[in-house]
């Protein structure tokens, strides 16, 4: 297979027929957060909210959010594709359709979705399509998956605001996918809180240098 064919394969979403079959049972993973000891899969305190962010390699993205005051817990996983219960190796082939994502569970009385979105937009490049820097493939695409209509509206308004800011600097267009949250498949144990376990590990986050003009009124 030529380099061009390999690139095309990794950057095109697979059809249902092309996607890997996956498996019926979830892959083994952690139940508690390595940094704060809180439950990765709930239950979480009443009134707390969730959002899924994809912004390239999930190692650095997860660390970014677990450090935010008001964020209760984070976890990494795969979402937005076809293959049920995929492994990391399967996801990297581009034949699952999933993006690497970070689940962020937060207390909206302490940190707002707008504040989380500001971090999301400023800490990666949302104009790169099916890649993030040197990381190439559908798994590294920019995504926001929300759990209710109000949050989706907030996310879409923030995309519009940041798109205008980027255009003012000659950048864009934004390729970030904003959708209702699909099923999250938790990643393997060694990926959870990876940079806490491996402080010198790879972190590919790099923004555009353009500030995001939010928070917006909710």
Swiss-Prot record:
Protein name in the entry: Peptide methionine sulfoxide reductase MsrA
Catalytic reaction annotation: L-methionyl-[protein] + [thioredoxin]-disulfide + H2O = L-methionyl-(S)-S-oxide-[protein] + [thioredoxin]-dithiol; [thioredoxin]-disulfide + L-methionine + H2O = L-methionine (S)-S-oxide + [thioredoxin]-dithiol
Source organism of the structure: Brucella anthropi (strain ATCC 49188 / DSM 6882 / CCUG 24695 / JCM 21032 / LMG 3331 / NBRC 15819 / NCTC 12168 / Alc 37)
Superkingdom in the source lineage: Bacteria
Family matches, as HAMAP family: MsrA
One GO cellular component term noted in the UniProt record for this chain: cytoplasm
E.C. number: 1.8.4.11
Family: Belongs to the MsrA Met sulfoxide reductase family.
GO BP term (any one): protein modification process
Region (Disordered), start-end ranges: 1-28
Gene (UniProt): msrA
């Amino acid at each position: 297979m030529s380099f061009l064919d390999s690139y095309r394969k990794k950057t095109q979403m697979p059809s249902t027929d092309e996607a890997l079959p996956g498996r019926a049972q979830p892959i083994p993973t952690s139940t508690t957060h390595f940094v704060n000891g809180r439950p990765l899969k709930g239950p979480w305190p009443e009134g707390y909210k969730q959002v899924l962010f994809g912004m390239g390699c999930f190692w650095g993205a997860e660390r970014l959010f677990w450090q935010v005051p008001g964020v209760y817990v984070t976890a990494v996983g795969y979402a937005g594709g076809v293959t049920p219960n995929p492994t990391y190796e399967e996801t990297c082939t581009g034949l699952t359709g999933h993006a690497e994502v970070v689940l962020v569970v937060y207390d909206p009385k302490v940190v707002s979705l707008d504040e989380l979105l500001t971090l999301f937009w400023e800490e990666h490049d949302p104009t790169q399509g099916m890649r993030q820097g040197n990381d190439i493939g559908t798994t590294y695409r920019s995504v926001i998956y929300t759990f209710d209509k109000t949050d989706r509206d907030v996310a879409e308004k923030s995309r519009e605001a940041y798109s205008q800011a980027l255009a003012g600097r000659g950048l864009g267009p934004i390729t970030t996918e904003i959708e209702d949250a699909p099923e999250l498949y938790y990643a393997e144990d060694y990926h959870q809180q990876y940079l806490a376990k491996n402080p010198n590990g790879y972190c590919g986050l790099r923004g555009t240098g353009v500030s995001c003009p939010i928070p917006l009124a909710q």
